[in-house]
């Protein structure tokens, strides 16, 4: 296990010992500029990512960040929302919102069940041989009568439940 982990560290992209984009140091691979929207993924159980959602700010957003350093009572509700959106991608309500992925999953499940049913039907019609004649109801009745005539298992079995004098099942 340890050699495998060591090789994965050496052979991964970015070289050995060099931290990637998701490191806590904030360095990027290749030394280029970071994108304006980072790869932060805020979840309900870890809502505070290490990096802000938006890293490159325009003049209006920079002025808003400077205004943030002052008293928060001077900020309007819209400015507070804009500051929140600069720092975080989603609100808790948006994080907790149910997705419609279950519809896709159920659609795929029903599609494959339907496809399997079509394959089974096709096999019964075109692949499997016809049923043997011994499986018809008439032949089954004849087999039962033959077993009763031979008195198969007369102590506890089938013949013990048949009344041979009245020719009917015992009650």
Curated annotation (Swiss-Prot):
The protein's gene is named COX4I2
The similarity comment for this entry is:
Belongs to the cytochrome c oxidase IV family.
UniProt keyword terms in alphabetical order: Disease variant, Membrane, Mitochondrion, Mitochondrion inner membrane, Transit peptide, Transmembrane, Transmembrane helix
Its organism's taxonomic lineage begins at: Eukaryota, Metazoa, Chordata, Craniata, Vertebrata
One GO CC term on file: mitochondrial intermembrane space
Disease link: Exocrine pancreatic insufficiency dyserythropoietic anemia and calvarial hyperostosis: Patients present with pancreatic insufficiency, intestinal malabsorption, failure to thrive, and anemia soon after birth.
State whether it acts alone or in a complex, and with which partners, per the record.
Component of the cytochrome c oxidase (complex IV, CIV), a multisubunit enzyme composed of 14 subunits. The complex is composed of a catalytic core of 3 subunits MT-CO1, MT-CO2 and MT-CO3, encoded in the mitochondrial DNA, and 11 supernumerary subunits COX4I1 (or COX4I2), COX5A, COX5B, COX6A1 (or COX6A2), COX6B1 (or COX6B2), COX6C, COX7A2 (or COX7A1), COX7B, COX7C, COX8A and NDUFA4, which are encoded in the nuclear genome.
User: PANTHER family annotated for this entry?
Assistant: CYTOCHROME C OXIDASE SUBUNIT 4 ISOFORM 2, MITOCHONDRIAL (PTHR10707:SF11), CYTOCHROME C OXIDASE SUBUNIT IV (PTHR10707)
What's its job? Component of the cytochrome c oxidase, the last enzyme in the mitochondrial electron transport chain which drives oxidative phosphorylation. The respiratory chain contains 3 multisubunit complexes succinate dehydrogenase (complex II, CII), ubiquinol-cytochrome c oxidoreductase (cytochrome b-c1 complex, complex III, CIII) and cytochrome c oxidase (complex IV, CIV), that cooperate to transfer electrons derived from NADH and succinate to molecular oxygen, creating an electrochemical gradient over the inner membrane that drives transmembrane transport and the ATP synthase.
InterPro entries documented for this protein: Cyt_c_oxidase_su4, Cyt_c_oxidase_su4_fam, Cyt_c_oxidase_su4_sf
Which pathway does it serve? Answer: Energy metabolism; oxidative phosphorylation
Could you tell me which CDD domains the record lists for this protein? Cyt_c_Oxidase_IV (cd00922)
**What is the species of this protein?**
Homo sapiens
The residue spans the entry assigns to the Mitochondrial intermembrane side of the membrane are as follows 127-171
Query: Which Pfam families did the record assign?
Result: COX4
Identify the stretch(es) annotated as Disordered: 13-32
Task: Give the Mitochondrial matrix compartment stretches of this protein.
Answer: 29-100
Transit peptide, residues from-to: 1-28
Keyword Transmembrane listed? The answer is yes
Spell out the protein name for this chain. Answer: Cytochrome c oxidase subunit 4 isoform 2, mitochondrial
């Amino acid at each position: 296990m340890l050699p495998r982990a060591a090789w994965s560290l050496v052979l991964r992209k970015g070289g050995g010992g060099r931290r990637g984009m998701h490191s806590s140091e904030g360095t990027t691979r290749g030394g280029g500029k970071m994108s304006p929207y980072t790869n932060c993924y805020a979840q309900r159980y870890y809502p505070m990512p290490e990096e802000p959602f938006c890293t490159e700010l325009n003049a209006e957003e920079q002025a808003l960040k400077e205004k943030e350093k002052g008293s928060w009572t001077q900020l309007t509700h819209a400015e507070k929302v804009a500051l929140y959106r600069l720092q975080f991608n989603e609100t808790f309500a948006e994080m907790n919102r149910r997705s419609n992925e279950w519809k896709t999953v159920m659609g795929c499940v029903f599609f494959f069940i339907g496809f399997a049913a079509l394959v089974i039907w096709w096999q019964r019609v075109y692949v499997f041989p016809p049923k043997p004649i011994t499986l018809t109801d008439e032949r089954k009745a004849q087999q039962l009568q033959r077993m009763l005539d031979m008195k198969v298992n007369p102590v506890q079995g089938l013949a013990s439940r048949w009344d041979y004098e009245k020719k009917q099942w015992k009650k």
